[in-house]
């Protein structure tokens, strides 16, 4: 007996490379979210990104203020913290796109 229709994805968000992420954020309706610390954000970030530190105690409260009807494109330094943030937001019903290589990969790619 087959169990077709039960092929859930292992994650509720998409993880993409730099080129795909650049295409996603070219849409001005997409919210760009940097989940690094304020200090890291101040040292450089993707243009137009807002900063909500995923490790802060108020991440869930602040992230809940994001518009629920818009895609959230998020990143951290290298792709670890962003997975945590993406899972939290996806569980809250947001459509989330995560940059696999983080800001380091973004800058290495010359973006």
Feature roles, as predicted:
Residues 32-34:
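Structural scaffold elements adjacent to functional motifs in cytosolic proteins
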Residues 1-24, 30, 39-71, 77-111:
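Rhodanese-like catalytic fold shared by cysteine-dependent sulfurtransferases
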């Amino acid at each position: 007996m087959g169990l077709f229709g039960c092929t859930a994805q292992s994650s509720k968000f998409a993880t993409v490379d730099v080129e795909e992420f650049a295409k996603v954020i070219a849409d001005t309706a997409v919210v760009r979210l940097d989940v690094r610390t304020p200090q890291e954000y101040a040292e450089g970030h993707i243009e137009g990104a807002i900063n909500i530190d995923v490790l802060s105690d108020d991440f869930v409260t602040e992230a809940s203020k994001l518009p629920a009807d818009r895609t959230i494109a998020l990143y951290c330094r290298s792709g670890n913290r962003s997975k945590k943030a993406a899972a939290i937001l996806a569980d809250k019903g947001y459509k989330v796109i995560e940059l696999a290589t983080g800001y380091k990969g973004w800058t290495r790619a010359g973006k």
